[in-house]
Curated annotation (Swiss-Prot):
Its main location: membrane. InterPro entries: CD225/Dispanin_fam (IPR007593). Residues 1-97, 161-172 are extracellular. Signal peptide: none annotated. It is found in: Membrane. Residues 65-83 have a biased composition (Acidic residues). Residues 60-86 are annotated as: Disordered. Residues 119-139 are cytoplasmic. The gene is Tmem91. Belongs to the CD225/Dispanin family. GO terms for cellular component: membrane. The keyword Zinc does not apply. This is Transmembrane protein 91. Keywords: Membrane, Transmembrane, Transmembrane helix.
């Protein structure tokens, strides 16, 4: 391509760039700027993200109230209702079903240990020991899986022993 055709292709783009660079900037930020920037500001509550205001379809209805983060935390802590069936995302799973299954159907000595650790998970959570509850939950899960694995190995060994016994018997 020659130099004149490149300039013809760039011509529609160049005036808008030069006009934007030469135009005086107003003090008020425009809504929907082509390249929005992200800024952070330090406040007494820590670092906060400052976002440019977004255009709204309900511009004539007034500014919506933004809830204060501290107010929502204090109102949540004052209520005794935990929201029904919703569980806290921090509550570790106790793996009680796996522990019961491993006691009843698999290798019961290890399953009993998994069952005890599953109960320790809930007791530690009730006392407020989040780390202890998480550790007990992980150990209960590992012992439950170990009990299932040992139970499967025991059942497989029993089937192999039974097959060997039946194969060695003389036919009637």
């Amino acid at each position: 391509m020659d130099n004149s055709s490149i300039q013809e292709l760039q011509q529609p783009l160049l005036p808008s760039i030069t006009c934007d660079l030469l135009a005086p900037r107003s003090e008020k930020p425009e809504l929907g700027t082509p390249f929005p920037e992200t800024a952070f500001a330090e406040s007494p509550r820590g670092w906060q993200l400052l976002l440019p205001p977004l255009p709204s379809v309900s511009a004539g209805l007034g500014e919506p109230e933004t809830p204060d983060f501290e107010d929502t935390l204090s109102s949540d802590s004052d209520s005794d209702d935990d929201g029904g069936d919703r569980l806290s995302p921090l509550l570790p799973h106790d793996h009680l079903g796996l522990a019961v299954f491993s006691v009843l159907c698999c290798f019961w000595p290890v399953g009993i240990a998994a069952f005890c650790l599953a109960h320790k998970t809930n007791k530690a959570w009730a006392k407020g020991d989040v780390q202890g509850a998480g550790a007990a939950s992980r150990r209960a899960f590992l012992l439950g899986v170990l009990a299932v694995g040992l139970g499967l190995c025991t059942y497989a060994a029993a089937l192999v022993t039974l097959a060997a016994y039946l194969a060695s018997r003389d036919p009637p």
